[in-house]
Amino acid sequence: MATATTLAIFAQAKQVTVTNNSDFNREVEPIVISINEKADYKSAVVSSDGNTLPYQLEDIDGNGHYDQICFITSLKKKEKKQFLVTLHKQEAEQTFTPQVYAEMMLTNKKIKSQNKQDLYISSLTVDNGTNPYWMLHHHGPAFENDMVAYRIYFDERQTIDIYGKNRKALELKETQFYPDQEQKANGYGDDVLWVGKTFGLGALRGWADNLPQMLLDVDKRTMEIVACGPLRTIVKVVDKGWNPFYPEKCDNAKRIDMTTLYTLSAGRRDCAVDVTFKGDIESLKLATGLINVKNSEEYSDGKGLRGCWGTDWPVSEKDSAGHKRETVGLGICIPADNIIKELPANSDNYPYVVKPALGEIHYHITFASDNETFPGSFHTPASFFEYLRQWKRQIESPVTITTKDVFL
């Protein structure tokens, strides 16, 4: 809640109407409104029916000015709600309880403990051929809400790995993705998936020679924490000057820029993946999908929704001491317009060949751990696959958002 507020006299207000046209309830619905970054707004008040709501101002393009605002609501089926969003040009003394967390850090070799690292960074860019995987603690940015946590490997794989939880809590600041034995005994979560060179949970790769290709030939690779709360985390991955024809060589004119945003909102286990491109992508083919967890059961609707449920060691054999086999459910939802082909499962992956549509790809990933003990958890393939079907219904029938300027 806001503890104190000191706002400017000059403000702009927007009346925001959100309509759930679906025949099902929406318990956690992020609402995102674009704002005029030239106005240089510094704070806001979001209210509905006399209640003030937490919000988050975001600078997606990184130019130092906020360009959108996010808040979260719930809606019953067919329900319509109105909100008043007032934007101010002065900063406000507001404190909202953090519901998400994100971190990226360099490994401090002077500190032996894996959950006491302290070299925090928010962005890193490396040149072609440079691999910072072993220089970064937990190998790249990590982000969470109280239900789930993700990390992205900072190397040519750019794999999404997962951290499952037993109870609802923010944990990464304390465990740094590597809980010690005392933390495990006290109910903290842990890494629950071994990904290797697979897609993990929905990594986007190149496609050439009828095979998925790692993003090996990239002029500059950047990973950045764009937003880290209080309501959602956004991690940006930029592959600037990527050769999409690898392993063949290409001249600079044929290289493209690929920017990927990974967005995790409070109260949701799924992560939105939004990919945009610069350059000639007319014939671009890409690959994504899910790791084929050992002995996993597969689900597919044949139209972009795919999942699996299985059990395996979450680490390599040499690191298995102190770990147990983990049971997880994984899911991916890709729009039909982006799908070239759904490929049969192989020993590593449940793969797709995909392409941009209108120059972009927007898909979603999700997972569940059998360790979860909180409401809304899943412990059978049948229940998880039913969740996937309902999840796709929500994705394909978004709420309607309209805005109208209001003069105060």
Q: Which residues fall in each region the model found?
A:
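Bacterial Sec-dependent N-terminal signal peptides
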Residues: 1-16
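Solvent-exposed beta-strand/loop surfaces of large extracellular or lumenal domains
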Residues: 45-69, 246-253, 294-313, 332-339
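Alpha-mannosidase-like glycoside hydrolase catalytic domains involved in N-glycan trimming
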Residues: 12-116, 120-122, 126-131, 138
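Solvent-exposed N-terminal domain segments of exported/luminal and surface proteins
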Residues: 89-216
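Extended, loop-rich substrate-binding clefts of extracytoplasmic carbohydrate-active enzymes
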Residues: 183-265
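Beta-strand-rich recognition/accessory modules
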Residues: 59-75, 330-408
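Primarily extracytoplasmic ectodomains and periplasmic/lumenal surface modules that are beta-strand-rich
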Residues: 23-27, 37-42, 92, 143-144, ...
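Acidic (Asp/Glu-rich), glycine- and aromatic
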Residues: 258, 264, 269-302
